[in-house]
Structures are given as structure tokens and as C-alpha cells.
A protein has these predicted regions:
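Cell-surface/extracellular proteins and modules involved
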Residues: 1-170
Length: 170
């Protein structure tokens, strides 16, 4: 099943000349239920590899690139250019388009580590805070990109149920 296959068709007159066309209602949005995302038995964590697209991941995991929409919907990805992990080459281009060479090494923010038991987290703090480390624009952007690398994949035994649920929602 393709993503838009079950979307409602509407009459739309884009020009306003009283000659409407039958079109797929692409404005319809479907979100995964919060309780379904909590069902970890249905999901497998996956680390997206270099140059993998949602289509490649879907093909590897679900056996067909047509299920890329499942990968994207499950991970709240609406724009693959902004929400999906960038390859090294894409990230470098993005950084050179956004920053000058000097700006890349400038401070983005400062942070400290806080630990409690076995857990350690980073907290942003003001410049000059004792023990704070500088995070450059480059380090910040790389970390932001890496956060997108780990995604959830639907286990194949739930794929049919997921498609049925999707069809009911659209």
C-alpha cells in the first residue's frame, strides 16, 4: 500500500475557473497514537547507516521500499530533508551553507554534566559557569544530526495491523 492510496479524493479548483479537478487530499494528516508508540514490543530500535534513506531502511526491514511511509510516520518524519539524519556529505554541505569557517568553531552554548547514580546528562549553562565546557556550532550541529540516527522500526508481524489502522484513520 502506498501512503496516499487511501486518502480521500476532493474536488479542487486551483485556478478558480469553475473547472475543479479530482485530487488526493494531501492536507490530511495521520499521527500515530501515543499509546502505540509506547508499545515497545512492537518496535525495534535501529541505527540508520551512512547514506540510508527511508526507502532503503524500509526495503531492508520490511522487504519493500514502498513501506518508507511506515518508517517516516512511526518516527514523526514529515520532511526527509530536515527530519532525517544527513549523510556526512550532506551535513558538510549544510554546514558550509549555514556557517563561515570561523563561525563553525565559535561557541554555540556551554554545558556541564550532571550525574545521578549510573545516569549522566548534559545541561546548558551560562558562559563562565564553573566546570562548563564549550560546545561549538560544529559540535552542536553534528550532535543534532546524530540524534536523528536512532529510529524505531515496526516489527513485521505488526505491519498488517498498522496498515489497517492507518486505513481506518484516513
Amino acid at each position: 500500500m502506498s501512503y496516499f492510496e487511501n486518502f480521500q479524493k476532493i474536488l479542487y479548483d486551483p485556478v478558480g475557473n469553475n473547472n475543479p479537478k479530482l485530487m488526493t487530499n494531501i492536507m490530511k494528516r495521520v499521527r500515530m497514537r501515543a499509546n502505540m508508540k509506547k508499545e515497545v514490543v512492537m518496535l525495534d530500535p535501529y541505527d540508520v547507516q551512512e547514506n540510508e534513506t527511508p526507502e532503503i531502511v524500509a526495503d531492508k526491514h520490511h522487504g519493500s521500499p514502498i513501506y518508507h511511509w511506515v518508517v517516516m510516520l512511526l518516527n514523526d518524519i514529515s520532511d526527509v530533508n530536515h527530519d532525517w539524519v544527513k549523510s556526512t556529505r550532506q551535513l558538510q554541505k549544510y554546514l558550509t551553507d549555514k556557517y563561515t569557517v570561523t563561525q563553525l568553531s565559535e561557541a554555540h552554548h556551554y554545558e556541564i554534566s550532571q550525574s545521578s547514580g549510573d545516569t549522566s546528562i548534559k545541561i546548558q549553562v551560562l558562559q563562565g559557569t564553573s566546570g562548563a565546557t564549550t560546545v561549538t556550532n560544529y559540535e552542536y550541529e553534528v550532535a543534532l544530526n546524530e540524534e536523528k540516527r536512532t529510529i524505531d522500526l515496526l516489527r513485521n508481524e505488526y505491519l498488517g495491523f498498522f496498515e489497517d489502522e492507518f486505513q481506518n484513520l484516513v
